[in-house]
């Protein structure tokens, strides 16, 4: 057994997967980013922006916490919807711990009720995380926590405001204590298992949603076609935004190309900040009819293609 200079044996490491499940827009992606301390997943006012399982990686004391940000769980209508919901529940069943998020303002509505009922069948310790507590009076929060715990037993209950970070440190510390003993699965300086090409595409997709949240429906996706690291340390990135109809392509381009220029500028700025080097971003918009029914697109997003 190795012994440190202090004469004490080094603390045994812990490592585990923690799945975050909940209704769309409950704040899962914001919480992942707050726990990690950096942006690893897309955040938008628009529901259903997370499509695949994105892992954020946190080191807390002697523990490595691998966060699985699942797509929001809802009643699926399209093929893409069904794939996203299936992915979310797979992430919950495969994890070591499950955090069930509730929106403090919405409470236990029909959507949350269905999630709680199904989450009860997951055979792992479950933690109740009530988010957006800054928007609700304390008495209502206590009643909500009690109502949720009556529906299923939670190992712990946390009340947080992910967007401001209130309560996040306590949650992180508890997750570190609850993940099982084991060696780290990722390098200590790694914050996500998503390739940078993928994260760059997600950042551009987020900017599209922020800019066009009223006009553009969900039938759009972004792919990073080219990633070139140049001699001057800058990075040249080419991305294609795919939409399903010509009318959508015109919306993304905007009058005189103004909209696509604005999206590109916002995306380039954020990617550059993350990489710490200048970024030259070139965006193209193409029509790919019925891409939502193409199995190859699902594989690229890390989703299983549902037969029907």
UniProtKB/Swiss-Prot annotation:
Record-linked PROSITE patterns: G_ERA, KH_TYPE_2
GO molecular function, one term: GTPase activity
GO biological process, one term: ribosomal small subunit assembly
SUPFAM superfamilies found in the cross-reference section: P-loop containing nucleoside triphosphate hydrolases, Prokaryotic type KH domain (KH-domain type II)
Chain spans, region G2: 48-52
Keyword presence, rRNA-binding: yes
Region G5, residue ranges: 160-162
Region (G1): 22-29
Binding, GTP: 22-29, 69-73, 131-134
UniProt region (G3), positions on chain: 69-72
InterPro entries: G_ERA_dom, GTP-bd, GTPase_Era-like, KH_dom-like_a/b, KH_dom_type_2, KH_sf_prok-type, P-loop_NTPase, Small_GTP-bd
Membrane topology per record: Peripheral membrane protein
Cellular localisation: Cytoplasm; Cell inner membrane
One Gene Ontology CC term in the entry: plasma membrane
UniProt keyword annotation of Cell membrane present: yes
UniProt-annotated stretches for the region G4: 131-134
Subunit structure and binding partners: Monomer.
NCBIfam families membership: era, PRK00089.1, small_GTP
Protein family: Belongs to the TRAFAC class TrmE-Era-EngA-EngB-Septin-like GTPase superfamily. Era GTPase family.
The protein's name in its UniProt record: GTPase Era
Species: Bradyrhizobium diazoefficiens (strain JCM 10833 / BCRC 13528 / IAM 13628 / NBRC 14792 / USDA 110)
């Amino acid at each position: 057994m190795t012994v440190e200079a202090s004469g004490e044996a080094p603390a045994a490491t812990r490592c585990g997967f923690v799945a975050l499940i909940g209704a769309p827009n409950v704040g899962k992606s914001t919480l992942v980013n707050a726990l990690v301390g950096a942006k690893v997943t897309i955040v938008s006012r628009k529901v259903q922006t997370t499509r695949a399982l994105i892992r954020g990686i946190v080191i807390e004391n002697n523990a490595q916490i691998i966060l699985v940000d699942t797509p929001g769980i809802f009643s699926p209508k399209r093929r893409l919807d069904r794939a996203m919901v299936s992915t979310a529940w797979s992430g919950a069943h495969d994890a070591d711990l499950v955090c069930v998020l509730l929106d403090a303002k919405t409470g236990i509505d029909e959507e949350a009720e269905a999630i709680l009922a199904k989450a009860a069948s997951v055979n792992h310790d479950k933690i109740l995380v009530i988010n957006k507590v800054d928007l609700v009076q304390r008495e209502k929060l206590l009643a909500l926590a009690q109502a949720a715990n009556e529906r299923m037993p939670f190992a712990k209950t946390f009340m947080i405001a992910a967007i401001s970070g209130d309560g996040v440190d306590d949650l992180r510390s508890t997750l570190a204590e609850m993940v099982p003993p084991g060696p780290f699965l990722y390098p200590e300086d790694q914050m996500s298992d998503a390739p940078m090409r993928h994260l760059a595409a997600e950042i551009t997709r987020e900017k599209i949603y922020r800019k066009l949240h009223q006009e553009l429906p969900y039938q759009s996706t972004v792919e990073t076609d080219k990633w070139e690291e140049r001699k001057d340390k800058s990075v040249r990135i080419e991305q294609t935004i795919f939409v399903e109809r010509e009318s959508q392509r015109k919306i993304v381009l905007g009058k005189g190309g103004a909209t696509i220029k604005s999206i590109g500028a916002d995306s380039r700025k954020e990617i550059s900040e993350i990489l710490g080097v200048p970024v030259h971003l070139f965006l193209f918009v193409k029509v790919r009819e019925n891409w939502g029914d193409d199995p190859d697109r699902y594989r690229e997003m890390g989703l299983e293609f549902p037969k029907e």
